[in-house]
């Protein structure tokens, strides 16, 4: 734990009390954080203490990395961005009740501050004003053990070196240690009470002798001691309960933070799933594609009216469709046309929006292309003229199609 309220952030860094996992924030020479880092003209950094050794009487007076000449600290500059980033880093309170021995982290039994997320720039303010676990040197004696800041009142009630007045009202003022001895020594404490012996040689005018007064004083002292012990126990119990409440609050805050992170993660997952569902919805009501046919000449030798050159099957949701291309027409009624037929194999009844675009290259003569939907919802000719394939030229056909399903109104 930190001792002495006059401690500075520079001391904390130089003593190695702060460890930063990112090596970019640590001095490349001493490995301590770059609290007061400086850099050469080429951007190579180190902490001020290491630079002072470099330019010292026995130093090399050159950059440890690029060997550029460094004669004084005036040849160096600060990296303000890096300094700002370092001070943003969050660390645990130094009064966390943990100490490191070698590579072993030991959790001390007296506990400590639970804060784990303090920005370095606010660390000193937290230690001095918020934490309560700062170790304070007793101002009454160097021989007295230091105490935690939150235990100031308890320490003042128990410190053996603190000056107090005798509770028996004798007027004596001394350290608590000496006052206790004073009270335990017979006949050493004489209360400041006027005793009148005019009517009674062994007592005062009211018939109360000196011995009774001393007994009364001692009784008062015992009552005060008992009261102080009760107060001490109440404070100890209260401190224990407060510490437990602080622990519970800390872990509750930590749990809330974890839950908030989980909520954000669930939001991201929901957004992803929503996007996937939208895509599935699109695929369930629409389908588009392209059919490319090369080298018809060889394919057409064995074909006649009613024979298709290609068939493509596809799904829109749970509905299965096909597209067939008949180079000589799908029937003798359509002989002389290239028939492109869209048909539904199975699925529910829908109205269809059909988009077909045909591009045929390599013909000499003209003939029309018939686009039809089976079993007869759509059948029409298009104005596009295509060339016949009775020549020796090779040609290709590109068919772009798009089908949208719409619920059928009954």
UniProtKB/Swiss-Prot annotation:
<comment type="similarity">
    <text>Belongs to the TNF receptor-associated factor family.</text>
</comment>
<protein>
    <recommendedName>
        <fullName>TNF receptor-associated factor family protein DDB_G0279745</fullName>
    </recommendedName>
</protein>
<keyword id="KW-0677">Repeat</keyword>
<feature type="zinc finger region" description="RING-type; degenerate">
    <location>
        <begin position="27"/>
        <end position="67"/>
    </location>
</feature>
<dbReference type="InterPro" id="IPR024957">
    <property type="entry name" value="Cep57_MT-bd_dom"/>
</dbReference>
<dbReference type="GO" id="GO:0008017">
    <property type="term" value="F:microtubule binding"/>
</dbReference>
<dbReference type="InterPro" id="IPR008974">
    <property type="entry name" value="TRAF-like"/>
</dbReference>
<keyword id="KW-0963">Cytoplasm</keyword>
<keyword id="KW-0175">Coiled coil</keyword>
<dbReference type="GO" id="GO:0008270">
    <property type="term" value="F:zinc ion binding"/>
</dbReference>
<feature type="zinc finger region" description="TRAF-type 2">
    <location>
        <begin position="154"/>
        <end position="213"/>
    </location>
</feature>
<keyword id="KW-0479">Metal-binding</keyword>
<dbReference type="Pfam" id="PF06657">
    <property type="entry name" value="Cep57_MT_bd"/>
</dbReference>
<dbReference type="GO" id="GO:0005737">
    <property type="term" value="C:cytoplasm"/>
</dbReference>
<keyword id="KW-0863">Zinc-finger</keyword>
<feature type="coiled-coil region">
    <location>
        <begin position="216"/>
        <end position="284"/>
    </location>
</feature>
<comment type="function">
    <text>Probable adapter protein and signal transducer that links members of the tumor necrosis factor receptor family to different signaling pathways by association with the receptor cytoplasmic domain and kinases.</text>
</comment>
<keyword id="KW-0862">Zinc</keyword>
<dbReference type="InterPro" id="IPR013083">
    <property type="entry name" value="Znf_RING/FYVE/PHD"/>
</dbReference>
<feature type="zinc finger region" description="TRAF-type 1">
    <location>
        <begin position="81"/>
        <end position="154"/>
    </location>
</feature>
